[in-house]
From Swiss-Prot:
Positions annotated to bind beta-alanine: 61
Organism: Maridesulfovibrio salexigens (strain ATCC 14822 / DSM 2638 / NCIMB 8403 / VKM B-1763) (Desulfovibrio salexigens)
Amino acids binding ATP: 30-37, 147-150, 176, 184-187
GO annotation (BP), single: pantothenate biosynthetic process
Family listed: Belongs to the pantothenate synthetase family.
InterPro entries: Cyt_trans-like (IPR004821), Pantoate_ligase (IPR003721), Pantoate_ligase_C (IPR042176), Rossmann-like_a/b/a_fold (IPR014729)
Protein name, entry field: Pantothenate synthetase
GO molecular function: ATP binding; pantoate-beta-alanine ligase activity
Its biological purpose: Catalyzes the condensation of pantoate with beta-alanine in an ATP-dependent reaction via a pantoyl-adenylate intermediate.
Alphabetically ordered keywords of this record: ATP-binding, Cytoplasm, Ligase, Nucleotide-binding, Pantothenate biosynthesis
Pfam entry (one): Pantoate_ligase
Note in the entry: The reaction proceeds by a bi uni uni bi ping pong mechanism.
Domain of life: Bacteria
Length: 282
């Protein structure tokens, strides 16, 4: 495995690889790998001749008073895990390599970025869309794989690629969970033992909502109200940031559950902001 930190060096290499007919896969990450990240690498590895994993804690997607400085990192551990997974290139740029001091160009997908996480994190998806565009330009991938835990992010990137005619096949990969049902996240390390014991109720609540829909309830307001009550009982130390039922592609908030709907939640539990979702098909 080769480690490259200079964007121009990686771009030159990838342009050469494409000219040679090599199929390039990219898995963008912020590091501190867990089995969720590794499953994305596996999915991309099966499809590509060259697998690139980027490791960059992108400062432009963090707002004030968020956890940029505290975000967990362990480059040595991540490098070992990536190499064992068959990664060919680990891309590890620093901030000054990715953003000039007078950086002034941003990529935004406002129609999909105002609900869910975008409501409480107004600059988040601008930073995500911009850095992913830069990674696509640098790594020149044919395929890029993202986790479905960040469903809104995935929808935004798919729309961005469609609207800007970026020649990348953007794929979503199913959520990987702990045995308890808690969605894997690098931020799970922030949880205390007590918090970790109640966090699996996030997924259980989503499953409850699916059961309510299956039983015939379609009113989104009623479903959300019932889920708020469930979380108040089962995660009393948590604070609900949002519970929404949205269209899975355009992220518009739904008043009634139709043939397909995404229930998405975000809960602040101690120092960890945990997100999860469940696609409900009637």
């Amino acid at each position: 495995m080769e480690t490259i930190s200079n964007p121009q060096e990686l771009q030159n290499l990838c342009l050469m690889l494409r000219a040679e007919g090599k199929k390039i896969g990219l898995v963008p990450t912020m590091g501190y790998f867990h089995e969720g990240h590794l499953s994305l690498m596996d999915a991309a590895r099966k499809q590509c001749d060259v697998l690139i994993v980027s490791l960059f804690v992108n400062p432009t997607q963090f707002g004030e008073n968020e956890d940029l400085d505290a975000y967990p990192h362990n480059l040595e551990r991540d490098s070992e895990l990536a190499e064992k997974r068959g990664v060919d290139i680990l891309f590890t740029p620093i901030r000054d390599d990715m953003y000039f001091e007078d950086h002034s160009t941003w990529v935004e997908v406002p129609d999909l970025a105002t609900n869910l996480c975008g409501k409480s994190r107004p600059i988040h998806f601008r930073g995500v869309a911009t850095v992913v565009t830069k990674l696509f330009m640098t790594a020149q991938p044919h395929v890029a794989v993202f986790g479905q835990k960040d469903w809104q992010q995935l929808a935004i990137i798919k729309r961005m690629v469609r609207d800007l005619n970026i020649p990348v096949d953007v794929q979503g990969h199913e959520i990987v969970r702990e045995e308890s049902g808690l969605a894997l996240s690098s931020r799970n390390v922030y949880l205390t033992e007590d918090e970790k014991s109640v966090a699996p109720n996030i997924q259980k609540g989503l499953q409850k909502m699916r059961d309510w829909v299956t039983a015939g309830e379609s009113d989104a307001a009623k479903l959300k109200s019932d889920l708020v009550e469930f979380y108040a009982e089962t995660i009393p130390t948590g604070r609900v940031d949002y519970i929404e039922i949205v269209h899975p592609e355009n992220i518009n908030i739904l008043k009634n559950v139709g043939d397909s709907a995404l229930c998405a939640v975000a809960i602040q539990l101690g120092n960890a902001r945990l997100i999860d979702n469940l696609l409900i098909k009637v």
